[in-house]
Amino acid sequence: MRHPLVMGNWKLNGSRHMVNELVANLRKELTGVAGCDVAIAPPEMYIDLAKRAAAGSHIMLGAQNVDLNLSGAFTGETSAEMLKDIGAQYIIIGHSERRTYHKESDELIAKKFAVLKEQGLTPVLCIGETEAENEAGKTEEVCARQIDTVLKTQGAAAFEGAVIAYEPVWAIGTGKSATPAQAQAVHKFIRDHIAKADAKIAEQVIIQYGGSVNASNAAELFAQPDIDGALVGGASLKADAFAVIVKAAEAAKQA
């Protein structure tokens, strides 16, 4: 039985005051929640502050990106060792905004995946198609290609304990969302694709949905058998909205 994971990606948002206030409110809103893992990924400079604010709670820490180098002359970068040292566990890689704005390739993202696994951290591998790819019927082709870059270099075993976040690019920050049936079909395809290499690992890998998840559509999404939680953007900046999503995941997977 897969344990759901709901993770908040704060993106480029935050201040010391906001971090303390949001985490304090999350702690209140999530009191008693045990059936869903919860993680937040603040901007890097606030990870330690968020960790202290979340101390003693079930809220886990993550980060929004990582460099593939562990140390050296790489100005402006943050290594997996540093993230591990500061207490981040769930590390987002391959987010569509990184792929688009920073031209990150599938090959680079696969290398980041390997570095995180070597450091004992949990990669949250974002995959998904653009609107043009979706309209051209290439959703499965794109998702398979993005997964295969890891499978072919590291094998199916690399996905043990890892997380995949399916984020249809056309649904991120647009208010659009795939229907629960559409999302389920892609999630099932992803799981079946990994199962070709290793059925046992495919069955246990967490596959989140990451396309404009909010309080109103969360319950219906999580009722789908292959949707194991969510990677949440805008709604993760509001404690009450984020808590509704977490509780919906908990309720759906206990049903």
Swiss-Prot record:
Database matches in NCBIfam families: tim (TIGR00419)
Native source species: Salmonella typhi
Give this protein's Gene Ontology molecular function annotations.
triose-phosphate isomerase activity
Name the Gene Ontology biological process terms: gluconeogenesis; glyceraldehyde-3-phosphate biosynthetic process; glycerol catabolic process; glycolytic process
Where in the cell is the protein located? Cytoplasm
Q: Name one GO cellular component term.
A: cytosol
Name of the protein in question: Triosephosphate isomerase
Q: What is its main location?
A: cytoplasm
- Assembly description: Homodimer.
Q: Where is coiled-coil annotated?
A: none
Reactions catalysed according to its record: D-glyceraldehyde 3-phosphate = dihydroxyacetone phosphate
